[in-house]
């Protein structure tokens, strides 16, 4: 079977269609009366109504179903700092996925600045147009402050998908992997390799879900509270709530006796011989792209029980598209002001529930994006959580 060159196919598609998106009117504009209703003079009445009651913007405009996909082009996929223009195809792709999987309209916005204050100001300036903000490909540690301040200062949900979308899908995979392995979430030991935005979010969501023993490993080794004064603030903060034994050392040291490895780091950093030192039935989530921390065949040969990656050509693909469309669908439907941790945990449980227990196996712990109505199940889970936590 001939291997497809997806890079060339993507270039050909972009050239043929001139991008992935278009704007389509929902209302007819075929006659003079149509024009008078859609634009002047009729539209003035709609604007006047909103001027009297700003909450009507949700009922009378596209705000209620529209999300901004915003990037500064600094940390795009595995390409790095490629700038605003080069980030545009990725943002278009994200917007297309919102529409395909959750019927959410979204607008790609790339910012020609990488200054934290300017990014925050720009997002706040355009926020009245949108029902939610999806931050994309903004590098750590800047992304932490940008997201936190926007959440605090805006009255619409703000979500950095590179952090939390990844964490939510990994958590969904963990729920089902533990069922297959016969382990309890409160008893396991987890090692998260990678102290960037995704790794720190994984650690925090695992803690919220009931994991008690987590160590985060970065280039300096195991993050420990006793070394907090030598760490950057975001690493010091995670060290204070993980690694309760205050262990230090390398990734190899951290893995001894661990049940779960979560890699959001770099290719080939997990050695097969280290898996042999892990607990019985080790679970490996190796999600570096395009090449994982260890390839599944190597991990399985070394004794891994379950292996997941970010790639579609291996079993158990851990893909953000399982999460973000449904999360925003649920948040928009309830007009939630925030996407809380409870809503994110609910989303993970919703994703996990899509595979019946009878169908779970070592090679089937996470659904495919095209299996059933993933986004609607996630959206329903998020809606219930929003209502339960008074975010709706």
Segments from the language model and where they lie:
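Solvent-exposed alpha-helices and their adjacent loops that cap or buttress functional pockets
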Residues: 15, 58-63, 99-100, 125-127, ...
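N-terminal ligand-binding/catalytic initiation module
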Residues: 1-158, 379, 385
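Glycine-rich phosphate/diphosphate-binding loop of Rossmann-like nucleotide-binding domains
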Residues: 77, 84-102, 154, 160, ...
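Rossmann-like adenosine-cofactor binding region
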Residues: 235-306, 311-313
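General beta-strand structural signal in soluble alpha/beta enzymes
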Residues: 108, 134-137, 158-161, 192, ...
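Adenosine-phosphate binding glycine-rich loop
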Residues: 161, 286-392
């Amino acid at each position: 079977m001939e291997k497809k060159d997806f890079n060339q196919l993507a270039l050909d598609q972009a050239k043929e269609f001139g991008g992935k998106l278009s704007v389509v009117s929902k209302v007819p504009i075929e006659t003079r009366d149509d024009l008078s209703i859609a634009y002047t003079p009729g539209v003035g009445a709609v604007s006047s109504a909103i001027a009297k009651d700003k909450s009507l913007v949700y009922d009378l405009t596209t705000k209620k179903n529209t999300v901004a996909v915003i990037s500064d082009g600094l940390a795009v996929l595995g390409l790095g700092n490629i700038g605003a223009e080069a980030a545009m195809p990725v943002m278009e792709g994200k917007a297309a996925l919102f529409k395909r999987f959750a019927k959410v309209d979204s607008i790609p916005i790339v910012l020609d600045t990488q200054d934290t204050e300017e990014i925050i100001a720009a997002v706040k300036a355009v926020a009245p147009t949108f029902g939610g903000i999806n931050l994309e490909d903004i590098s750590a540690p800047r992304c932490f402050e940008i997201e936190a301040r926007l959440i605090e200062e805006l009255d619409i949900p703000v979500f950095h998908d590179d952090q939390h979308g990844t964490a939510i899908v990994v958590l969904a995979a963990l729920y089902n992997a533990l069922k297959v392995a016969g382990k309890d979430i409160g008893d396991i030991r987890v090692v998260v390799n990678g102290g960037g935005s995704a790794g720190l979010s994984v650690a925090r969501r695992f803690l919220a879900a009931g994991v008690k023993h987590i160590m985060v490993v970065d280039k300096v080794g195991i993050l420990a509270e006793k070394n907090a004064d030598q760490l950057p603030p975001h690493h010091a903060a995670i060290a204070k709530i993980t690694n309760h034994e205050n262990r230090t050392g390398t990734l190899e040291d951290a893995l001894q006796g661990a049940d779960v490895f979560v890699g959001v780091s770099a290719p080939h950093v997990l050695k097969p011989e280290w898996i042999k030192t892990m607990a019985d039935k080790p679970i490996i989530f190796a999600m570096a792209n395009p090449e994982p921390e260890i390839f599944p065949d190597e991990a399985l040969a070394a004794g891994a029980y379950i292996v997941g990656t970010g790639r579609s050509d291996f079993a158990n693909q851990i893909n953000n598209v399982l999460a973000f469309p449904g999360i925003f669908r649920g948040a928009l439907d309830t007009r939630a002001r925030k996407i809380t941790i409870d809503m994110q945990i609910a989303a993970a449980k919703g994703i996990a529930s899509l595979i019946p227990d009878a169908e779970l196996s070592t090679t089937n712990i996470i659904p495919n994006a095209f299996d059933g109505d993933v986004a609607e199940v996630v959206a329903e889970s998020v809606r219930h959580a929003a209502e339960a936590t008074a975010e709706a």
